[in-house]
UniProtKB/Swiss-Prot annotation:
InterPro entries: TMEM147. This is BOS complex subunit TMEM147. One of its GO terms (molecular function) is ribosome binding. Residues 22-34, 91-100, 158-166, 219-225 are cytoplasmic. Pfam families: DUF2053. Its main location: endoplasmic reticulum. It comes from Xenopus tropicalis. It is a multi-pass membrane protein. Keywords: Cell membrane, Endoplasmic reticulum, Membrane, Transmembrane, Transmembrane helix. Residues 59-68, 127-131, 190-196 are lumenal. GO terms for cellular component: endoplasmic reticulum membrane; nuclear membrane; plasma membrane.
Length: 225
């Protein structure tokens, strides 16, 4: 039973990535090693972020249950490094914009999935007692994949030299929202004392709105040119 539960969680977390890779056409371009390089860039960026946070933002020692809004906001600002990392990955790949976006997003999201969820699923989902948090973790990995696709598309649009002026503001706003999404989520959860399923639903809704807005801008920009 425990192995069956682990298999379900593993399939829910990893199969959408495999299906996306196969159905997006990346496999036809032999983009596997490009995605691996994007994943390696993710690891380097996260290491730099960890060193920076450990140096300039030590653990906050406030009251129990209190939330350091200013400190967490400053920490969320460090996620700007993720945008720079995605831009670096896309700038090193030749090809159409769609290809660059998919390679960067797949490599980035897969590296995060392996590094942050593989071990917890292997250790926890095989436990004797069933726990919904591993199902939630698997669903959250799918939300992260959609999130990074949207972020990669926004970075690609923002760095285009021929981006029309009237696109600059909405793209910048969406980039800011994507960068501070985790911080805003933590604020909502802390203020409204949300449960885990409610927080996951809110994250899915915010990611969906962000992704649909990004898709609208991307389609209008590509077709407009």
């Amino acid at each position: 039973m425990t192995l069956f539960h682990f298999g379900n969680c593993f399939a829910l977390a990893y199969f959408p990535y495999f299906i996306t890779y196969k159905c997006s056409g990346l496999s036809e371009y032999n983009a596997f090693w490009r995605c691996v390089q994007a994943g390696a860039t993710y690891l380097c960026v996260q290491l730099c972020k960890m060193l920076f946070l450990a140096t300039f933002f030590p653990t906050w020692e406030g009251a129990v249950g209190a939330y350091d809004f200013i400190g967490e906001f400053m920490k969320a600002t460090v996620d700007l490094a993720d945008l720079l990392g995605l831009h670096l990955v896309m700038s090193r790949n030749a090809g159409k914009g769609e290809y660059k976006i998919m390679v960067a997003a797949m490599g980035w999201a897969t590296a995060e999935l392996v590094m942050s969820r593989c071990l917890p699923l292997w250790v926890g989902a095989r436990g004797i007692e069933f726990d919904w948090k591993y199902i939630q973790m698997s669903i959250d990995s799918n939300i992260s994949l959609v999130h990074y696709m949207a972020v990669a598309a926004l970075v690609w649009m923002w760095t285009r030299y021929d981006l029309p002026t009237h696109y600059r503001l909405p793209v910048t706003v969406l980039l800011g929202l994507s960068m501070y999404k985790a911080f805003l989520m933590d604020c909502f959860v802390h203020i409204f004392i949300m449960g885990s399923w409610t927080a996951l639903l809110l994250k899915a809704v915010i990611t969906g709105v962000l992704s649909l807005s990004c898709l609208t801008l991307f389609v209008s920009l590509v077709h407009g040119n």
